[in-house]
Curated annotation (Swiss-Prot):
Gene Ontology process terms (BP): negative regulation of proteasomal ubiquitin-dependent protein catabolic process
Function per UniProt: Is a negative regulator of proteasomal degradation of a set of methylated proteins, including DNMT1 and SOX2. Involved in the maintainance of embryonic stem cells pluripotency, through the regulation of SOX2 levels.
Biased composition (Low complexity): 443-453
Composition skew (Acidic residues), residue ranges: 879-892
Record note on quaternary structure: Interacts with methylated DNMT1 (DNMT1K142me1). Interacts with SOX2.
UniProt keyword Zinc, yes or no: yes
Domain of life where this protein originates: Eukaryota
Organismal lineage: Eukaryota, Metazoa, Chordata, Craniata, Vertebrata
Originating gene: Phf20l1
Protein name in UniProt: PHD finger protein 20-like protein 1
GO CC terms, sorted: nucleus
UniProt keyword Magnesium, yes or no: no
Species per Swiss-Prot/TrEMBL record: Mus musculus
Basic and acidic residues biased stretches: 496-505, 533-565, 824-852
Amino acid sequence: MSKKPPNRPGITFEIGARLEALDYLQKWYPSRIEKIDYEEGKMLVHFERWSHRYDEWIYWDSNRLRPLERPALRKEGLKDEEELFDFKAGEEVLARWTDCRYYPAKIEAINKEGTFTVQFYDGVIRCLKRMHIKAMPEDAKGQVKSQHPLSWCCPIDPAGSCNQSMGSEDWIALVKAAAAAAAKNKTGTKPRASANSNKEKERDGGKWFKLPSKKAETSTCIVTAEIEKKEELPTSSETFGLHIDTVPKIVFPQPESTLTNKRKNNQGNSFQAKRARLNKITGLLASKAVGVDGAERKEDCSATAPVLEQAISPKPQSQKKNEAVISSSANTQKPALLSSTLSSGKARSKKCKHESGESSGCIKTPKSPLAPELIQAKDLTLVSQLSSVINKTSSPQPVNPPRPCKHSERRRRSQRLATLPMPDDSLEKLSSSSSATDGKAFSISSQNQQQSSVPEVPAIAYVPLQKLGPCLPLDLSCGSEVTGSRTPHPSYHGGECPREEKEETPLFANPTSKVVSDVKGAAAATGISKTEKKVKLEEKTSTAFGKRKEKDKEKKEKRDKDHYKPKQKKKKKKKKKSKQHDYSDYEDSSLDFLERCSSPLTRSSGSSLAPRSTFTEKTTTYQYPRAILSVDLSGENLSDVEFLDDSSTESLLLSGDEYNQDFDSTNFEESQDEDDALNEIVRCICELDEENGFMIQCEECLCWQHSVCMGLLEDSIPEQYICYICRDPPGQRWSAKYRYDKEWLNNGRMYGLSFLKENYSHLNAKKIVSTHHLLADVYGVTEVLHGLQLKIGILKNKHHPDLHLWAYSGKRKDQDQAVAEAERKITPQDRANSEGKECVQNHKEPALRMEETYITSEHSYQKPQSFSQDCQSLTDPGSSDDDDASSFEEDGELRVPDKSHLLYKNRGVSEKNPASGNKVFVYNDKKGTEGPGDSHLQWQLNLLTHIENVQNEVTSRMDLIEKEVDVLESWLDFTGELEPPDPLARLPQLKRHLKQLLLDVGKVQQIATLCSV
């Protein structure tokens, strides 16, 4: 009786269906159903990209199975009666704003793609999907027009202007009422000063600064400051630097009783919170414009140029002397100059840094220029007109967020600004940012001066404003502290800053002396020609080089004199050697032929520099946040990856004097301190990237750890130290940790107990290595014989489908020549070619193409379609050595006659080329031209020739193995350790010894766990 699979949402119980399954290591992997057993109620699950040996039978109701894409079950219950409503144009609805709250709105149009163009009750037009619109209750439909008269009673005509039908007296009265209501709100309820309240206020307030647009909108982050304090300051239109004639006037046709009684209405309490916040902002803006003469009207603005929102910051009291200049410039501004102002402003603010955690709040800006009918040429709202007027007299400022200063002395990793090629507008950034540190947010008169000399400004390529990322906020209530908080303050360049800050920015070494206090001075700095800039930049960079060298010398002297600072352990980088085992001191000369070149798979310093080298192409003078620069390489979170400057090789190269002198190990360590200054990465278990106290370096990934965190002291550092990540790589199988534990395979050394005077593995290392080589040769021969059996089976079966793979005619090549050609194509590596001995050391060789020469491998039989997968398993760090037993382990045209040669390459053991005169087949691209009758015979002939060659290879290898066994036996007989071969008599003793050894190892493991150093 067959059982029916359970109903599990997202899982299809059929063969080939994909899902996620939990393996025995408690990790989820995408999987596939291979078989289904309806009787037992379980399925054979295959983990994708893993070998089939890990396929597992899992019950179909097990919690180890889950859908590949989790369905959102909560959305299925949201289907209510809302779908029954068919909205029409002009209908009043509740539309959702960006704060996920619903506010009254009116449908303007229904688009073809199923979206609705709605106008909110405050005049903002947005394009929303059907899911963001609700039907308005019947009892609330008639209340909206009387509650908020701003946009419902001032309809928007096609020209984009607001029809004003009443006099300015009602408007002034309404403004006073709004100001009184806002003041009453402030005294009644004390505003919260938390970041969340500021964020919420600016998010809702940002809707007022938004221009109507039917197009998609992007949100750029803004920086919030003490808005509450700024709101309480009594300001007027003079604070903005605007003439009294330039402030727009808006007529509100409803009396003030409508606005004051608005909060008492209980029927509209669902959107009462937003109205209160908007009234607060309205009252604030109204209090700033109370002194406006209501009889005068502002002349027509430019309806063609798009009004872009820029940073507006009121000037401090110390700058009131420039109000006359500012107001006159505001009157003389023409709409035709707006585009040139924006372009020059863009050129000055060419690079805008990403804020690293300082942004709190978002504001909406149009992604593209607005449609002409949506641009309000006259007075739609007060804020939009204020922004359009003040934007003509303002320009964006380059933003330089201060880097966080750390009190602890950190090692200099790079000097970016002093040596990188700086763009031409860097001096403009310098002048503008230094003036911003003095409290001046921006200068309008300097903008006028720049506009008057627009042709003289050098043509600097600039990034469009939409691509600048977070720009300065459009916030009328923010003061100069907002801009000041995002520019380098002089206190950040004091004594508590790290040394790298001073070295890399010599231009800002004394910012107080560089501050341009006069507005004309800042404008003059922006008008410097290219040649003067280049000359000054060359002088600055040359002085920066000199300063850096002097500081390097001072650092060296200070290190020698400072006896209290613990010496940091600097391990020498291991240089690749062609030989690690030297048997010259041994008495027996017959062991000389056992010399093999081992392949220590130590990662070179270049591999640790690989992620950094990708950033050297960028010549920008700013630093990305560390969160963006974090690179994940097999679990290594390189959070300190920074730019390398062009002079980084200067400290890495020894000068002529240092080349000639013979320096001891201490001098080498000191010089290596300078070499590794740019390469050091601190990756400790404590997750702090600071160098404190005694540091130890991993010999594989060259990362540094605190010895205290690792539980090691200065006198207990092992000879070979490998960090915790290299020993147990995250996201990989357990067997991956043996890649870095190669001492046992290469040198025959194992870790011993510290209380023992003699280590057995150290005393008998040569014997252990010879035994390892012997076992590797035997293992390689067994694999060759297995492949030979498969090929003999093909030869016996005339109708085997894979017999045609031997249809190529071949020519012979010397094996040494083939190996040499392959090594020329492989990445540069250390080779030791002496007397026919070959050594392949690099285990990360690129997998080359092997379409038609795969049959030269005599140890394995495989279809050609799986070449890419097998080669990928070699280069993939996530795959283990024993992932696929039948995989080829060849590299392109590397014609080595046994798999063990490349097997040793992967496992850290390399073998000598056993027979230098052997030949292998390298086939041509030509296919056989025989007829169909002779084809099978020719294929069998080619295969037979190949099998004979492989048998000859096996014979020569067996001779080599026999010699190795003879040498090993004579060696053991010479030392007296060879006992008569009676394994059956010693079997019980061997079992007892193995059992006791396991018990002892378990005790040692418990001791190490409980008694950590």
